[in-house]
Regions:
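Segments of small-molecule ligand-sensing domains
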Residues: 255-365
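Pocket-lining segment of extracytoplasmic ligand-binding domains
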Residues: 90, 133, 169-274
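Bilobed "Venus flytrap"/periplasmic-binding protein-like clamshell domains
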Residues: 31-55, 123-190, 307
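Bacterial N-terminal signal peptides
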Residues: 8-19
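A structural signal for short loop-to-beta-strand junctions that line the ligand-binding cleft
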Residues: 106-120, 125, 247-255
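Extracytoplasmic
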Residues: 29, 41, 57-59, 69-72, ...
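N-terminal (or domain-start) structured segment
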Residues: 27-91
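Pocket-flanking alpha-helical
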Residues: 63-107, 185-187, 204-211
Length: 365
């Protein structure tokens, strides 16, 4: 009887501890969300890369959510449950900071608790017109019918800000259309609008996946370096180039344009579990950065693993900042300590390879 009772108790304890262990394992996996951008934009691909190459190795199940863009992302990061990360354009973030500084209480409530993880890459600003348009340069868009992107998108912020900087006035209400990127291009082709402003990192899936026949009906406007409007736009935006190599079956030459920086943003969390998960995310980001650059969207090749100084009203998230700085320092120390590897040609008896050795794959043996 005693043996039977002890066996039963042992079974109960085993069941209890196995259940507890299983529950502990489940609890260790964090289920977070990141808000990105439109379905065919660059942001959503960057979010997918972070989920695969950074969050997953850190034990975080990161769901990648589409959105209208940066302004909506700020709001969702601030108020939507489960959203722990967001991709945000620098001009949108700065607009919130400026409005808060000017006394807008709602802007202050929204932006003050947000913190940066790190800057990412520059996003090109495309000014798209029909191929038969008489316009050649960006400073010619005054008084034209323009789609500036969806309300809540970073594109809308960039488009309206650039117009105001260049021409000293807002776009007239009757000339503004708030269309998605796809709808804007469709409206452009059927002549319902004159210009579509689109913000996306090159190569943008929106254009690379576009029907080749439709693609031949549109082109990009260029920055005129000598136009007075260009000098005024430089107050906020930076010169950039849309490379023909990004769209080799379409563009015949590079196109000068403007750019805006993308940032990875979080909230000033202080709950122990969340802080711990985001620390692991930071460690994984540093450790797997090479995978992002080699396996992710081409824009990752432009990202530098560094934390530059920030302007007033901008702050890094301290727990992540500490981990990233420590990891960056370790990487730098390792690179300094490692001797420079000889080139393939120098590996053959310390002399350059001959043409014959190269042909026979004898270099580097």
């Amino acid at each position: 009887m005693l043996k039977t009772t002890l066996a039963a108790l042992a079974g109960l304890f085993a069941l209890f501890f196995s259940t507890f262990a299983a529950g502990g394992t489940a609890a260790a996996d964090a289920h977070y969300k990141i808000v990105t951008g439109q379905e065919r934009g660059t942001y959503i691909q960057i979010g997918q890369d972070l989920a695969k190459w950074v969050a997953q190795p850190a034990g975080i199940d990161l769901t990648v959510l589409p959105s209208k863009g940066s302004a909506e992302n700020v709001q969702r990061l601030r108020f939507e449950p489960g959203v722990k990360l967001a991709l945000v354009q620098s001009d949108v973030y700065q607009a919130y900071v400026d409005m808060a500084k000017a006394g807008n209480e709602e802007a202050g409530t929204t932006i003050r608790p947000l913190r940066l993880i790190m800057p990412l890459y520059d996003e090109e600003i495309y000014f798209v017109v029909r191929n038969d348009s008489p316009m050649k340069t960006i400073n010619e868009i005054k008084d034209k019918v323009i789609s500036v992107g969806l309300i809540g998108s970073g594109t809308a912020q960039s488009g309206t800000t650039l117009y105001r900087l260049m021409f000293g006035q807002p776009i007239p209400d009757q000339n503004v259309q708030n269309l998605s990127n796809e709808d804007a291009l469709a409206a452009l082709i059927v002549k319902k609008i004159d210009v579509a402003i689109i913000v996306a990192g090159q190569p943008a899936k929106l254009f690379t996946d576009m029907n080749p026949e439709l693609l031949q009906q549109i082109r990009f406007l260029r920055v005129d370096p000598n136009a007075p409007e260009t000098a005024r736009a430089k107050q906020t935006y930076f010169p950039a180039t849309i490379h023909a190599s990004s769209y080799p079956n379409w563009l015949k030459e590079d196109v000068p344009t403007w750019t805006v920086k993308a940032f990875l943003v979080t909230y000033d969390y202080n709950l122990r579990d969340t802080v711990g998960n985001l620390k692991r995310f930071a460690d994984s980001l540093c450790q797997n950065f090479n995978n992002l650059q080699s396996q992710g969207h081409p824009k990752w090749k432009q990202v530098k693993l560094e934390l530059p100084g920030l302007g007033k009203g901008w702050q890094y998230y301290p727990p992540v900042e500490q981990r990233l700085k420590a990891c960056i320092a370790r990487r730098a120390a390792m690179q300094t300590a490692m001797p420079q590897a000889p080139t393939a040609e120098q590996k053959v008896t310390g002399r350059p390879c001959t043409d014959q050795e190269r042909l026979l794959l004898l270099c580097g043996k």
